[in-house]
Amino acid sequence: MDYADFDHQKLVEWLKAHGEKEFHAKQILSWIYQKGVLSWDKMSNLSQSLREKLAKHIRLPVLELVRYTESIDQETIKFLWRLRDGNLVESVLILSGIRRTVCVSSQVGCPAKCAFCASGQQGFFRNLRPTEIIEQILQINAWLSSKGEKVSHVVYMGMGEPLKNYESVVASIRVLSHPDFCNISQRRITVSTVGVVEGIKRLSKEGLKVNLVLSLHAPNQHIRKKIIPYARKYPLEEILESMDEYAQKTKRDITFEYTLLAGINDHPDHAHELAHLLKGKQCTVNLIPYNPIPGLRLKRPEKKAIKQFRSVLYGSHIVNTCRYTKGDDIGAACGQLALQEREGQTGLPMLKEVAFGS
């Protein structure tokens, strides 16, 4: 069993079944989720016999840190984790002012296969379990603790399509936001999706208050189908209706991400079409100039084209931002997460890079 399979009540029941006092449950959860201790041996206020029982029956930890790499500006750190089956996933820590945002992966690889995203080019291998998602935060929290800091925001924008691993993602959100666990406000948690309609509708009924982001990337279904194969399954009109439903039920504004690709979706006409598509919606468009990926012929638009695109949106009263690229020098920017060099393990290949501090 994994430790994340236990909430307080389940842990109390487990302790009683193994002849232990129930008050240990609060101690154990505090060690793991508040202190970031992922070793039974280091839980000093537990008896040796209890620690041995825990070690025998409950797995801890589930991720092994292979390496972490820091960007030149020291504002982005990419972590490479090995799972117990040998597969590898990545997380990114973004330092911005007082914010400490972690971009977590929800799958090994990604089934969406977006034309401009490195993760999608690698194919899909498997879903992550809730524990494997949660521990990305716990281990980075432990890494930050030496600086007296902790994770403040979580974005499900790493490897994978979160809503195609629905149960694990929702379970991880509940743990990360629970006051007795990581206590990260749901308003500081963001889930990104390419537009899995049934997942969006289901999420709107969960009673969660997380932010929802649609990876739109095109002003119409015709272009979207070309750059996002998943779009063939989900008509744009249905996706937008489900996003509206989410906004209405959760009272949360929604965000549309739009990767600008030179000569594909960056013309002023595309901007006018996008403005018409989103007219009347309480939303923000987050423009992302394409981050180059080796082997792909796609290009980032010129600054003039980006400025013109934004001007059209502003003129149509569409709130928009242009994301400042962070971590592109270490392959940690939006769309760049991928693993590029096999070392004999199963699943995705290992990232080719030099470990920070080596």
Curated annotation (Swiss-Prot):
Cofactor binding mode and count: Binds 1 [4Fe-4S] cluster. The cluster is coordinated with 3 cysteines and an exchangeable S-adenosyl-L-methionine.
Enzyme class at the top of the EC tree: transferase
Positions of S-adenosyl-L-methionine binding: 160-161, 192, 215-217, 291
Predominant place of localization: cytoplasm
UniProt GO BP: rRNA base methylation; tRNA methylation
Reactions this protein catalyses: adenosine(2503) in 23S rRNA + 2 reduced [2Fe-2S]-[ferredoxin] + 2 S-adenosyl-L-methionine = 2-methyladenosine(2503) in 23S rRNA + 5'-deoxyadenosine + L-methionine + 2 oxidized [2Fe-2S]-[ferredoxin] + S-adenosyl-L-homocysteine; adenosine(37) in tRNA + 2 reduced [2Fe-2S]-[ferredoxin] + 2 S-adenosyl-L-methionine = 2-methyladenosine(37) in tRNA + 5'-deoxyadenosine + L-methionine + 2 oxidized [2Fe-2S]-[ferredoxin] + S-adenosyl-L-homocysteine
EC number, UniProt record: 2.1.1.192
One of the Pfam families matching this protein, by short name: Radical_SAM
Residues annotated to bind [4Fe-4S] cluster: 110, 114, 117
Cofactor(s) listed in the protein's UniProt record: [4Fe-4S] cluster
Disulfide links within the chain: 103-334
Active site: 90, 334
CDD domains (UniProt xref): Radical_SAM
Record key words, sorted: 4Fe-4S, Cytoplasm, Disulfide bond, Iron, Iron-sulfur, Metal-binding, Methyltransferase, rRNA processing, S-adenosyl-L-methionine, Transferase, tRNA processing
Protein location: Cytoplasm
Domain Radical SAM core: 96-328
Any single GO CC term annotated in Swiss-Prot or TrEMBL for this entry: cytoplasm
Any one GO molecular function term: rRNA (adenine(2503)-C2-)-methyltransferase activity
Xref: HAMAP family: RNA_methyltr_RlmN
Function in brief: Specifically methylates position 2 of adenine 2503 in 23S rRNA and position 2 of adenine 37 in tRNAs.
Protein family membership: Belongs to the radical SAM superfamily. RlmN family.
Note: Reaction proceeds by a ping-pong mechanism involving intermediate methylation of a conserved cysteine residue.
Listed name of the protein: Probable dual-specificity RNA methyltransferase RlmN 2
Protein's organism: Protochlamydia amoebophila (strain UWE25)
